[in-house]
C-alpha cells in the first residue's frame, strides 16, 4: 500500500475540522471531522497532550445488515517510521450485535479485544468517543494507522486511513519510505481476515507485560511513564486462522475474566443514543407530571367551591280568601227554584258559556258594599228573573 507524507494528512485534517466528513466503505462508513492529529514533543520526550481522533462507524444507506443480528471484527494497523513493515496493534471481535440503522457495533452481546503490549498508551474504542486516543505519545507512535472493519460474512473489508504526526526539533516525523520489501499478504490492503493472536509482539527483552486479551483496552493499560519501550520490527507471518488446539493431555489454564466481554461493554451507549432515549422519556415524564397537576388542581377546586342552598319558595302560612256570601246564597236559591235541566249533549259547544250577570255583578261588588243599608223593596213589584244560559 503506498504511503503518502503526513504533511498532506495534516493539511487535509485542518480543512476537515470545520465540517464532518463521511468516508464510505463497502460494508460500513466512518463519520469524523478529523482523520489526523498532531503534537509536539516536550522536554521529557513525550507529547503532553493526548492525541485524539474523533469518529463513529455508521451504516449508511444500503449498508445496514439484512439479518437481525450480525458479527464483525475491527483491526488497527500501524505503519511506523523508517523501513518497517506494518504491524497489527489491536484486534476486536464482536458477536450478536443487533441491527440498527445508525451506529455500528452497538449493544453487542460479546466483545473480545486483543491489544499489543508494545503500544501501552494507545486506545481504540468503538462504543465511545474518541475513536482513537494516544496518551503521552512518543515519536514511535507517529505514522499512519489503518482501520480495517469486517461486517458479517462480507468478503471485503472497509479500510479507513488515520494519521498521527509528532513534531521533533522543528520537523514533522512522518513515514516517507516505500514498503516494497514487505510481504503483500502482510499489508492491510491484501491481508486476509486476522485472528486475535495476530497482534504485534515485541521482542522478549523489550516487552514489559505479556499480550493480554481484554474487553476494553483501557482496563489493562499500565500507568504512563516517561520511558516507553519502542515498537520493534517484525517480519513473522501472521496466522490467518484460529490457533491449533492442544492435545487432550495438556492442562489448559482456565480463562480469566479479562478474556471475556464484560457486562459494561454489552450495554455501552453512545452520546447520540442517550439523547435519543432521553428526549422521548422527558416528554413522557412532562405529560405525566402535567396530568397529575391538573387532576390535583381540579380536585382542590371542587372541594373549595361553596355549596349554595337550592332555591325553595316559602309557602304562605295562611290562605286568606274573600267569599261573597250573598252571591253564594243567591246561586243556591236559583239552583233550587229551577228544575233540573236535561243532560247536555256530548257535542261540544262552539260558544263559551257565560256566567250569570247578577252573579258577576255581585262578585264584582267591593267588600265594603255589603255593609251599606239596602233600600226598601216594593212587594208589588215583580222580581226579575235572571236569564239562564244553556
Curated annotation (Swiss-Prot):
Residues 202-237 have a biased composition (Low complexity). It is found in: Virion membrane; Host cell membrane; Host cell junction; Host Golgi apparatus, Host trans-Golgi network. Residues 1-20 form the signal peptide. Residues 373-390 have a biased composition (Pro residues). Residues 21-276 are virion surface. It comes from the Viruses. Belongs to the alphaherpesvirinae glycoprotein I family. In epithelial cells, the heterodimer gE/gI is required for the cell-to-cell spread of the virus, by sorting nascent virions to cell junctions. Once the virus reaches the cell junctions, virus particles can spread to adjacent cells extremely rapidly through interactions with cellular receptors that accumulate at these junctions. Implicated in basolateral spread in polarized cells. In neuronal cells, gE/gI is essential for the anterograde spread of the infection throughout the host nervous system. The heterodimer gE/gI serves as a receptor for the Fc part of human IgG. Dissociation of gE/gI from IgG occurs at acidic pH. May thus be involved in anti-HSV antibodies bipolar bridging, followed by intracellular endocytosis and degradation, thereby interfering with host Ig-mediated immune responses. This is Envelope glycoprotein I. It comes from Human herpesvirus 1 (strain 17). The lineage of its organism: Viruses, Duplodnaviria, Heunggongvirae, Peploviricota, Herviviricetes.
